[in-house]
Amino acid sequence: MTEMRCRILISQTVSPIKVGITACSNPHPVSFRPELAVLQQTLRELGQESVCSPYLFSDEYGLSGSGTDRADALMQLFHDPEIRNIYDISGGDMANEVLIHLNYDEIRESSATFWGYSDLTTVINAIYTRTGKPSVLYQIRNLTGDDAALQQARFRNEEELFHFSYDFPQGTSMSGPVVGGNIRCFLKLAGTPYF
């Protein structure tokens, strides 16, 4: 059995790794800028230098680019060979708008791992279905939330972030890929080439 290893690459003894921050779903209000600055500083302290999509913040109508625009911004991050992780800081209802505009062959070849949650479940599962490449169901904004100290400690230690305690109600083991996430959003993929 091959164990999936995500490319976190966190170390205080090497130069910072490059990561992307994007929003494939609902954008944040402009008032979120200070929180983004705190997140970027936290990532910097964790050895990660970030570059941002131009579609993080909403306009006067609550939107930020079309599905095509947001997909193009995501693909630019996947194209950058220096980017190791792409953190989507959005969530809501609009992530499925990007699916038909993504180049899955280029995503497969990219060294970057996609991270997101909520309706980013659609992007995570589309990437897996179309490329076989794993993503991470995690909201990077947890690093600056109410449990920031705990989340940052887990983030620094890959074992704590990806290996956790559990009990089997029946049997003693299982194997295979884990898919899913937000079930409402996962079901949006039913009957599509992304399911």
Question: At which residue positions do the language-model features occur?
Answer:
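Short glycine-enriched loops at secondary-structure junctions
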Residues: 91-93, 120-121, 183-184
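ATP/NTP phosphate-donor binding region
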Residues: 2-82
